Amino acid sequence: MLAREHKTNIIEQYKTHANDTGSPEVQIAILSTRITELTDHFKAHKKDHASRRGLLMMVSKRRSLLDYLKKYDTERYKSVIQKLGIRK
């Protein structure tokens, strides 16, 4: 789980306007951070299958947000991909 301060920092980095908390960029960045944390968790806890299911759901949600962004605003999509270092 992300700490409140860490989540706030991510929102500050990726927001598109002053009160932005739900734009696709912010959601993708938060999901990417959670995915990275869970990936590290699985290195130590290989048999944690319940959390693995959660990880797969997060990856799927991030993929759909990326697809949405790619469909409606390709420039923002490319920017997010580059900032986060996600494969296409």
Curated annotation (Swiss-Prot):
* GO BP, one annotated term: translation
Family in the record: Belongs to the universal ribosomal protein uS15 family.
Claim: Cytoplasm is one of the keywords in the record = no
Write down the InterPro entries for this protein, in alphabetical order.
Answer: Ribosomal_uS15, Ribosomal_uS15_bac-type, uS15_NS1_RNA-bd_sf
Molecular function (Gene Ontology), one example: rRNA binding
- PROSITE patterns from the xrefs? RIBOSOMAL_S15
- The residues that cross the membrane are none
Protein role: One of the primary rRNA binding proteins, it binds directly to 16S rRNA where it helps nucleate assembly of the platform of the 30S subunit by binding and bridging several RNA helices of the 16S rRNA. Forms an intersubunit bridge (bridge B4) with the 23S rRNA of the 50S subunit in the ribosome.
- The name of this protein is Small ribosomal subunit protein uS15
Keywords, ordered alphabetically? Ribonucleoprotein, Ribosomal protein, RNA-binding, rRNA-binding
State how it assembles.
Answer: Part of the 30S ribosomal subunit. Forms a bridge to the 50S subunit in the 70S ribosome, contacting the 23S rRNA.
